Amino acid sequence: MSDINWQTVKEFEDITYKKCDGVARIAFNRPEVRNAFRPKTTKELLDAFSDAHEDTSIGVILLSSEGPSPKDGVYSFCSGGDQKARGYQGYVGEDGYHRLNILEVQRLIRFTPKVVIAVVNGWAVGGGHSLHV
């Protein structure tokens, strides 16, 4: 992997998004919570997948994760929805609307004409398991 010159496309808080030689790499970047997703994460995933979908130079999209967890050194692909971000009536985004939009991420993954490969390096639980199959 050291020979790959990944270029950061855009800075995000919950994910990393890089490209190199026709390959896009989108990775969960919340290892402290086993890469659980929250509304902000799904918005960032939608932005990154949409960009990779529209970029004609990209043929392959890798979905992966950063890690390990600083708490115990364990790697996790994704542990699903972040239960700490879940309110009384479900997930609430920064704008106050109740939504998680992970189904939109799944739809974009399934219908993009690009090859999407899940690089599952660790636990994949709940909604995280649904993303890699």
Residue ranges of model-derived segments:
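Conserved CoA-thioester-binding segment of acyl-CoA-metabolizing enzymes
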Residues: M1-P68
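Glycine-rich beta-to-alpha active-site loop
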Residues: P70, V105-V133
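Glycine- (often His-adjacent) and acidic-residue-rich active-site loop
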Residues: S65-R107
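Hydrophobic/aromatic residues within transmembrane alpha-helices
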Residues: I26, L63, D82, L131-V133
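Short, flexible helix/strand-to-coil boundary loops that buttress conserved ligand/catalytic motifs
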Residues: F37-R38, G81, G90, V120
